[in-house]
Amino acid sequence: MPLLEPLNQLKIPIVGSPLFIISNPDLVLAQCLNGIVGSFPALNAREEEGEPNMLEIWLKKITEGLDKYNQKNPDNPAAPFAVNHIVHRSNVRLEKDIDICAKWNVPIWITSLGARPEVNEVAHQVNGIVLHDVINNFFAKKAIDKGADGLVAVAAGAGGHAGTLSPFALIQEIREWFEGPLLLSGSISNGGAVLAAQAMGADLAYIGSAFI
């Protein structure tokens, strides 16, 4: 199955992982301008005294930076960017954050810790795609049933909300029924590992630590 449109714009089949605290607009722009998806957690854009709309400031900087580059390089466009949302009920910022991301037409939405159809619907209203973090086959099926477009298989060795399953087992189980966009996360740091992820059945690789 062909990749969804935003993911077809990559020069290298990699997504820069949304690194808590670390990922920021400068890193995202550097990643996108070099042909991979740059991403950041929405919660990294922390509201400061006198500046309550930091997420909007970040999205403005990223969007304008990519637009400026693309205007100068129409034959060599930048890769798209993604914003990671913690969709668990404990995230009191979620509703405000998704409204801001919709306003700025974020092209790729990465969701974690819960499958929320209402978040997927907002993303789709602005022609965005949703990739959902999963640690096993049960949650993978649940995410697709609730409207996610693709999956991030978080296997053993991944950072953040890490899984425990072997990437061989996890990718194989998901590919038995799912033909859509599938990403693999977990101890991937070089081209050989990216190629191995694709050989297993993943479309794209998630890389985080290499960008620290």
Cite the ranges covered by each PLM segment.
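Active-site entrance/lid segments in N-terminal catalytic domains of soluble metabolic enzymes
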Residues: 1-181
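Catalytic alpha/beta core domains of metabolic enzymes, predominantly
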Residues: 166-212
